[in-house]
Amino acid sequence: MSKVTGVENNSKLRFKFCWVIALRAEAAPLIDAFNMKIVENKSLFPIYANEETGHALVISGMGSIKSAAAATFLKNHLKINDYSAWINLGIAGFFKDPIGDMYQANKVVSKESGTAFFPGLRLSKLVPAAILFTVSKPENGYKEKALYDMEAAGFCEMAPSFSCNELTYVIKIVSDTPNASSSLITKHLVRELIEKQLSKISAILSEIEILVEDEKKRLSIPNEVLEFEKRFKFTETNKYKFREIYRKWKVTFPSRNLDLSEFLNSKPKEIILKLEKEVLANAKDWNVL
């Protein structure tokens, strides 16, 4: 079975949370908690989803490149919306005990390239923050006061382009430390560590969902914009310019609506120019421009 009933490959689905998970043992508690079913199991990257709960998940396997590729595959396969949140959750090594603690990675550094990423808005009331180093092979030295994983840098390089950096999150649960060797990690332990944090994960998702809804509203296209585009046959280039200037115009004149009668004999470029002039003449906040 490669598809679950109700999930169509070519439809634009309404997923709020997109999970990119390295290991099946890490994914299993999330799949169960959010009632996800298999959507795609014939490719390198298995996908699970539940449109009703708003969750989609891809299992990437280990490695930064695989994480980036799996995120891209999930985005394209399910036609994920631009307002969805992207979350990389999994186990990580840490420089101190205990295992089982959960952290938000507020800075992710690729040990291989030195590139640094700063994913997500801080969820300081819910989870502590830590720096995370993405390495190409398991880290046993714990030389830095930081988390260690093998995927997050690749995820952080790709995922923000699907939504925005503020909706890109890296959450890690400590699985090994200098006093708890990575050689002791089992599938059962991995699953247990994540299951114990499910209530806190749910609280984190509640906060992220607020941001998702805000972004959805920001990206929504008002009916009057669609009416103008249909009436005046905007090219794709002019459509983009029109939507951008409309957004600024609406910030400047929040109580006004576009009056079709003012533009009956106008061309798309003339409509854009008229709105630009009104914004320039009346904008009180220079950030609007």
Language-model segment annotations:
Residues 1-14, 287-289:
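Short, low-complexity, intrinsically disordered N-terminal peptides in bacterial proteins
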Residues 7, 30, 280-282:
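Short amphipathic alpha-helical "recognition" segments used for binding
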Residues 11-18, 55:
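Extreme N-terminal starter segment of soluble prokaryotic enzymes
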